[in-house]
Amino acid sequence: MDFHSCLYDIAERLGNEELAALKFLCLDHIPQKKQESINDVLVLFQRLQEEGMLEEDNLSFLKELLFHISRRDLLSRVLKSSPEEMVRELQVLGKAQVSAYRVMLFKLSEDMDKEDLKSFKFLLITEIPKCKLQDNSSLLDIFVEMEKRTILAENNLVTLKSICFRVNRSLLGRIDDYERSSTERRMSTEGGEELPVSVLDEVTIKMQDMWDSPGEQESESLNSDNVYQMKSKPRGYCLIFNNNNFSKAREDIPKLSNMRDRKGTNYDEEALSKTFKELHFEIVSFSDCTASQIHEVLVSYQSKDHKGKDCFICCILSHGDKGIVYGTDGKEASIYELTSYFTGSKCPSLAGKPKIFFIQACQGNNFQKAVPVPDETGLEQEHVLEEDSSSYKNYIPDEADFLLGMATVKNCVSYRDPTRGTWYIQSLCQSLRERCPRGEDILSILTGVNYDVSNKDNPRNMGKQMPQPIFTLRKKLFFPPN
């Protein structure tokens, strides 16, 4: 097979995703500007020939590219090279033509799943314009944008490491391997020159800035002073109030005559039960409770001895309005009163321990609409944020160690799919199952839930939904899976 037939044969067997991977791996040889007109593999091969990277008597760079994108079939069948030969060749100092840095980034993109990618994009919102972080943007696209803005480079992995630390800590292993091998290569070529100061301290500080309040300049180690203990088994009680049948409310209260049953709520109960059981909580479920029954149950758990437990969780799935949830009888139960049963004075055995409430209920009748997000933060946005945060001051006690996860902001509706469950609870459970094993804290997880739910649209009225976490936690809260 002649040279051009060989290239044509390879190009015919490579898809669009593989073309994107090849272009990324070639960035050190073909700059981004010159790559803009490359829309198929044959054009890429032409550019490589122009740059002297691809010649009839020298196919080493092409072999290396196919090796890195795991097209071993083309490597062996068309180019007559085995993966073992490539491994041996690339171990020879100076033989590799694709930088270890770029290979590391490419492999990182292969390691990251869709949920990781979604979180990665969210954490870059302040660094990269939202138009560059659309759903169809791949991680390779984002790496290119990060490089353009000088927040990612061969000698600058601080932002990358800090985000990977939050999204999925297992990703750090590949970066650490790259840094270690890079150091070894540098020492071997520079005769043992003294190593530069590690960037680890800078990474730690950056991660701390992302987690804590502005102005803190020193990282903290994770210990009992800044992390809630979560070792007991069971961790604590997880109460689930699942209200579905509102026929009594329709009969007894005229203004609620149009209140519907909550079809699909059982999917939420199942998801919550499964999720928190996996996280070692003792699940106790209650179906179709009146307002007084909800109060009675919480009073009974207020009086229980929680000394051997590290946490308390209460989930309420019901209809609601501003500051209240409805019992199935249509009577109102104040969210503030429900959470206040577990203050330190009323429930001493839970003092200093996290008390968590997840409320899936509307908080009004307004529909949230999509609005453009400006690239720059302004005074108006700060004002809105201030109002949003202050409007919830009476939902939880003025006391430490409470977390309230609301499905929606004040005055607005939340959405439930009769065949799948609610947007909020389903996203919450999926995020907890995926991210707790990675060592993420609850506030990071809830931030991801906000991002996920806020990107959904109600097809009937294009309504949006924005969950609202409210908390007085003093420490980081993790739910270890073991």
From Swiss-Prot:
CDD domains: CASc, DED_Caspase_8_r1. Its EC number is 3.4.22.61. It catalyses: Strict requirement for Asp at position P1 and has a preferred cleavage sequence of (Leu/Asp/Val)-Glu-Thr-Asp-|-(Gly/Ser/Ala). The keyword Zinc-finger does not apply. The modification Phosphotyrosine is found at Y336. One of its GO terms (molecular function) is ubiquitin protein ligase binding. Transmembrane segments: none annotated. The modification Phosphoserine is found at S188, S213, S390. Generation of the subunits requires association with the death-inducing signaling complex (DISC), whereas additional processing is likely due to the autocatalytic activity of the activated protease. GZMB and CASP10 can be involved in these processing events. Phosphorylation on Ser-389 during mitosis by CDK1 inhibits activation by proteolysis and prevents apoptosis. This phosphorylation occurs in cancer cell lines, as well as in primary breast tissues and lymphocytes. SUPFAM superfamilies: Caspase-like, DEATH domain. The record marks E218, S219, E376, T377, D388, S389 as: Cleavage. It is an enzyme of class 3 (hydrolase). Residues 2-80, 100-177 form the DED domain. Pfam families: DED, Peptidase_C14. Gene3D superfamilies: 3.40.50.1460, Death Domain, Fas. PANTHER family: CASPASE 10, DED DOMAIN-CONTAINING PROTEIN. Thiol protease that plays a key role in programmed cell death by acting as a molecular switch for apoptosis, necroptosis and pyroptosis, and is required to prevent tissue damage during embryonic development and adulthood. Initiator protease that induces extrinsic apoptosis by mediating cleavage and activation of effector caspases responsible for FAS/CD95-mediated and TNFRSF1A-induced cell death. Cleaves and activates effector caspases CASP3, CASP4, CASP6, CASP7, CASP9 and CASP10. Binding to the adapter molecule FADD recruits it to either receptor FAS/CD95 or TNFRSF1A. Belongs to the peptidase C14A family. Heterotetramer that consists of two anti-parallel arranged heterodimers, each one formed by a 18 kDa (p18) and a 10 kDa (p10) subunit. Component of the death-induced signaling complex (DISC) composed of cell surface receptor FAS/CD95 or TNFRSF1A, adapter protein FADD and the CASP8 protease; recruitment of CASP8 to the complex is required for processing of CASP8 into the p18 and p10 subunits. Component of the AIM2 PANoptosome complex, a multiprotein complex that drives inflammatory cell death (PANoptosis). Interacts with CFLAR and PEA15. This is Caspase-8. The lineage of its organism: Eukaryota, Metazoa, Chordata, Craniata, Vertebrata.
